[in-house]
From Swiss-Prot:
Name of the gene encoding the protein in the UniProt record: MBTPS1
Record-given protein name: Membrane-bound transcription factor site-1 protease
Transmembrane segments: 999-1021
Signal peptide: 1-17
Modified residues (Phosphoserine): S168
Disease in which the protein is involved: Spondyloepiphyseal dysplasia, Kondo-Fu type: A disorder characterized by severely retarded growth, spondyloepiphyseal dysplasia, reduced bone mineral density, and markedly elevated plasma levels of various lysosomal enzymes. Additional features include pectus carinatum, kyphosis, a waddling gait, brachydactyly and dysmorphic facial features. SEDKF transmission pattern is consistent with autosomal recessive inheritance.
Coiled-coil blocks: none
Membrane topology: Single-pass type I membrane protein
CDD domains, sorted: Peptidases_S8_SKI-1_like
Organism the protein comes from: Homo sapiens
E.C. code: 3.4.21.112
PTMs per UniProt: The 148 kDa zymogen is processed progressively into two membrane-bound 120 and 106 kDa forms in the endoplasmic reticulum, and late into a secreted 98 kDa form. The propeptide is autocatalytically removed through an intramolecular cleavage after Leu-186. Further cleavage generates 14, 10, and 8 kDa intermediates.
Length: 1052
């Protein structure tokens, strides 16, 4: 039995440790070595950004020598009579080359010198210099959690970054992303992410990233790190005199891309160019990045990894330089952000069309909870966001190089980004015609070959999971052409096409806008020939829809946009069914060589469209969301709605029904309401079509014409529901930012909502909000509620219904750190317009219960009740009979807030003129008018399946076979005694398998199967040996008694 126990013990060890077969321990002591599959450290990223006082970046229209730049600035400032200025020296590797910017210091308050600079013909723009702070803090996680348990039990919060920061989260493998522990299919997790994605197949073919220049913009790299053999150059762009990595993040990123041993990278033979752009104190400046980007262009970098990001897509010098980089054929790969699962949290530059934006998944192919979601918010309020991320790949528990050697595991999209950057570097080395590789063609190959993940929408996964081998197949058959992202529009396909598939279209509704990205692999510049053509399929009722187009006049760099507005024709107002058609566009680019005498390359692309049409819903079921009056960072400082959330100082998610109000939108749809978005002033919608106008967290001002029209609309039956937020000038001054280093104040431009503007809108009905600031938990109609930094109602009509509660005075707490309880705070008001056919108005002082950003307890039930009231005039019994109902406040003892003096809202407002003094409205803009495309009907049947892998040049991926491995396969040797890590391979080529899952899993199970069979036979042998022996029967001699008394026999 001892032998049996030994075999069973071996079997258990093999079953529990099969994941680590072939791995070598990085530590010699079992007691000190943690489980290789998980770590007990979590990396928390905290960051901020401030404007450096008196320092400005002067951008020029071209590249000039230092002498010429100095001359331009001097001549411009001479006429302004500004004497106290100087050019700040920049001592870095690009100082000896011409540059397109300069950093100057001007100590003046009137900004006359800045205006004079901008008037100079050679100066393009003058913007403030920004100082960036990042803090990477390691925190102990719960060591009692088993290695194979999910780590999603912790609460993830949006970091709401002010700046570009490293996008790594922590260490440890997350093998499953379910929130609850449950029975699930387990499989062997490969050792290395490069082998998981089958990079070893390309290694065996002889491709290892050789002759490809890859840049890593991060925290540096040690000179003699054992994992790297081809570090071509290390440059320092900071004010510290070191090139080494004191934090480890840059080393990890470089290791994922090009490590040659232990935690193997994708391209071990690539030429590494290390750009140290962060100090050991985790500080950086915009100008450091600009200089480093210029140097990367000079060095003809092929691939650039940027595992940093921030929400400021209006940081013009940075964004412009990224465009210039990609225009110079640099393939930029960037992390999409770690602010998931909240929508509308994409980081720049990953959200740019010319950049490959990467999201994260775990090793079970689930979207990582931390990975930021789309849509882009550049286009709001008038348009609709683009599809991002582009692709997703492994970003949870990925192993990479440690700062002094060995391996560590980290999680975050800054981990997923170098995975794609390494894969791209490897792919570039496989292409024979290197001139065909550019930022567009590489992105086309990646998204066309990506594997779609089931049950995940387009704003979470982009085009799907990175597939390295399929991308290799496409690139090696590629011919320059244009393509689209997404490659089709199917408003009936759920969940992938969410939110488009969540609501059918109908006559009279706001047009549905789909923002498509055009990728132009033919050249850095291009154009759309003539206009796009709309061709409806008559057998599929395509003539029941009409489309309008808006598109880039010039496709640069490598990309552009095509916005398609889809609406229903009047003849289909009562029709229900599916309508289909397609759009044809032709893209032209200049010829590749001058020998073609100015001839253009052209590429024609088809965009299928499929929509579901229903009869126009009744007015009572139609809700109009006011997007036009919602503002968000960037560019202004619009503070958070919940002042308790100190780690998220800005309101930057767009305040859209498909971003941070997504859950509210989903709830309204489940209740049968149809929600449309208004991206124009109130003068641009037909109020007779809608039952309720929903205004939530509004920060914008109002045109006088809007106020007058809204009054008429409410008198004629339109209802109004307003969810407000705090506005207190004393608190606004208190929450301003102060930087001890730069002595710079950053003042809020408004409160959580623009209460002074709302009060002007409501004054005609004798309503208004106060400047009170309240917080607390309460119960309303048997529902637990939380009031998070809300305001109160200052005045309300006497014949209205008002609900009050008892709260803490949060304003007093913020200002004086004192606690006080206030009773009978009016928070909810309901009012019926007395005129016949008039609408209804509802006021509520807090929007956090609808906002996904920091919602603690939702109030969707309350929204349902309020919409029942506004749509049908029935006061909910739970509110009309509430014990908290009080007499409406007359406004005599309440204070309504005034606009804060010195605010800069006019700089970012669509309503106010930019001038000193009292705010003055701009002229009312014209309402957008769409030009519907002339249809070119087709009397043919539409394709049945719109989703097909985007076939570039009719490449059939299912029929393409990988080439045979090259004969010069690498020779591997075992590790020498004392050497840590994996195999050491001459030439940097790493052994692998054709199919990672088959190659790794089959030998393991075969070995385990053999062990089971062997154990079975051992058990049987031991049983046979231990069984008591059976005695042989002996022939007994007859006894005397038997002879005397014979045995009885049956009688017949």
């Amino acid at each position: 039995m001892k032998l049996v126990n030994i075999w069973l013990l071996l079997l258990v060890v093999l079953l529990c440790g099969k994941k680590h077969l072939g791995d070598r321990l990085e530590k010699k002591s079992f007691e000190k070595a943690p489980c290789p599959g998980c770590s007990h450290l979590t990396l928390k990223v905290e960051f901020s950004s401030t404007v450096v006082e008196y320092e400005y970046i002067v951008a020029f229209n071209g590249y000039f020598t230092a002498k010429a730049r100095n001359s331009f600035i001097s001549s411009a400032l001479k006429s302004s009579e500004v004497d106290n200025w100087r050019i700040i020296p920049r001592n870095n590797p690009s100082s000896d080359y011409p540059s397109d910017f300069e950093v100057i210091q001007i100590k003046e308050k009137q900004k006359a010198g800045l205006l004079t600079l901008e008037d100079h013909p050679n100066i393009k723009r003058v913007t403030p210099q920004r100082k960036v702070f990042r803090s990477l803090k390691y925190a102990e996680s719960d060591p009692t959690v088993p290695c194979n348990e999910t780590r999603w039990s912790q609460k993830w919060q949006s970091s709401r970054p002010l700046r570009r920061a490293s996008l790594s989260l922590g260490s440890g493998f997350w093998h499953a992303t379910g929130r609850h522990s449950s029975r699930r299919l387990l499989r062997a997790i490969p050792r290395q992410v490069a082998q998981t994605l089958q990079a070893d197949v390309l290694w065996q073919m002889g491709y290892t990233g050789a002759n490809v220049r890859v840049a890593v913009f991060d925290t540096g790299l040690s000179e003699k790190h054992p994992h790297f053999k081809n570090v071509k150059e290390r440059t320092n762009w900071t004010n510290e005199r070191t090139l080494d990595d004191g934090l480890g993040h840059g080393t990890f990123v470089a290791g994922v891309i090009a490590s040659m041993r232990e935690c193997q990278g994708f391209a071990p033979d690539a030429e590494l160019h290390i750009f140290r752009v962060f100090t050991n104190n985790q500080v950086s400046y915009t100008s450091w990045f600009l200089d480093a980007f210029n140097y990367a262009i000079l060095k003809k970098i092929d691939v650039l990894n940027l595992s940093i990001g921030g929400p400021d897509f209006m940081d013009h010098p940075f964004v412009d330089k990224v465009w210039e980089l990609t225009a110079n054929n640099v393939i930029m790969v960037s992390a999409i952000g770690n602010d998931g699962p909240l929508y509308g949290t994409l980081n720049n530059p990953a959200d740019q069309m010319d950049v490959i934006g990467v999201g994260g998944i775990d090793f079970e192919d689930n979207i990582a909870r931390f990975s930021s979601r789309g849509m882009t918010t550049w286009e709001l309020p008038g348009g609709y966001g683009r599809m991002k991320p582009d692709i997703v790949t492994y970003g949870a528990g990925v192993r990479g190089s440690g700062v002094k050697g060995g391996c560590r595991a980290l999680s975050g999209t800054s981990v997923a980004s170098p995975v794609v950057a390494g894969a791209v570097t490897l792919l570039v080395s496989t292409v024979q015609k290197r001139e065909l590789v550019n930022p567009a063609s590489m992105k086309q190959a990646l998204i066309a070959s990506a594997r779609r993940l089931p049950g995940v929408n387009m704003f979470e996964q982009g085009h799907g999971k990175l597939d390295l081998l399929r991308a290799y197949q496409i690139l090696n058959s590629y011919k320059p052409q244009a393509s689209l992202s997404p490659s089709y529009i199917d408003l009936t396909e759920c969940p992938y096409m969410w939110p488009y598939c969540s609501q059918p279209i109908y006559y009279g509704g706001m047009p549905t806008v789909v923002n498509v990205t055009i990728l132009n692999g033919m050249g850095v510049t291009g154009r759309i020939v003539d206009k796009p053509d709309w061709q409806p399929y008559l057998p599929q009722n395509g003539d029941n829809i009409e489309v309008a187009f808006s598109y880039s006049s010039v496709l640069w760099p490598w990309s552009g946009y095509l916005a398609i507005s889809i609406s229903v024709t009047k003849k289909a107002a009562s029709w229900e069914g599916i309508a289909q058609g397609h759009v044809m566009i032709t893209v032209a680019s200049p010829a590749e060589t001058e020998s073609k005498n100015g001839a253009e390359q052209t590429s024609t692309v088809k965009l299928p469209i499929k929509v579901k049409i229903i009869p126009t819903p009744p007015r009572s079921k139609r809700v109009l969301w006011d997007q036009y009056h919602n503002l968000r960072y960037p560019p202004g400082y619009f503070p958070r709605d919940n002042l308790r959330m100190k780690n998220d100082p800005l309101d930057w998610n767009g305040d859209h029904i498909h971003t941070n109000f997504r859950d509210m939108y989903q709830h309204l749809r489940s209740m049968g309401y149809f929600v449309e978005v208004l991206g124009a002033p109130f003068t641009c919608f037909d109020a007779s079509q809608y039952g309720t106008l929903l205004m939530v967290d509004s920060e914008e001002e109002y045109f006088p014409e809007e106020i007058a029209k809204l009054r008429r609309d409410v008198d004629n039956g339109l209802s109004l529901v307003i969810f407000s937020d705090w506005y207190n000038t004393s608190v606004m001054r208190k929450v301003k930012f102060y930087d001890e280093n730069t002595r710079q104040w950053w003042m809020p431009d408004t409160g959580g909502a623009n209460i002074p503007a709302l009060n002007e809108l409501l004054s005609v009905w004798n309503m208004g909000f106060s400047d009170g600031l309240y917080e607390g938990e309460f119960t309303l109609a048997n529902h637990d509620m939380y009031y998070a930094s809300g305001c109160s109602i200052a005045k309300f009509p006497e014949d209205g219904v008002v609900i009050t509660q008892t709260f803490k005075d949060q304003g007093l707490e913020v200002l004086k750190q004192e606690t006080a309880v206030v009773e009978n705070v009016p928070i909810l008001g309901l009012y019926q317009i007395p005129a016949e056919g008039g609408g209804r108005i509802v006021l509520y002082g807090d929007s956090n219960c609808l906002d996904d950003s920091h919602r603690q307890k939702d109030c969707f039930w309350l929204l349902d009740a309020l919409l029942q009231y506004t749509s049908y005039g029935v006061t909910p019994p739970s509110l009309s009979h509430s014990g908290n109902r009080q007499r409406p406040p007359s406004g005599a003892g309440s204070v309504t807030p005034e606009r804060m003096e010195g605010n800069h809202l006019h700089r970012y407002s669509k309503v106010l003129e930019a001038h000193l003094g009292d705010p003055k409205p701009r002229p009312l803009p014209a309402c957008p008018r769409l030009s519907w495309a002339k249809p070119q009907p087709l009397n043919e049947t539409a394709p049945s399946n719109l989703w097909k892998h985007q076939k570039l040049l009719s490449i059939d991926l299912d029929k393409v076979v990988l080439p045979n491995f090259r004969s010069n396969r690498p020779q591997v040797r075992p590790l020498s005694p004392g050497e840590s890590g994996a195999w050491d391979i001459p030439g940097g080529i790493m052994p692998g398998r054709y199919n990672q899952e088959v190659g790794q899993t089959i030998p393991v199970f075969a070995f385990l199967g053999a062990m089971v069979v062997l154990a079975f036979f051992v058990v049987q042998i031991n049983k046979a040996k231990s069984r008591p022996k059976r005695r042989k029967p002996r022939v007994k001699r007859p006894q005397l008694m038997q002879q005397v008394h014979p045995p009885k026999t049956p009688s017949v």
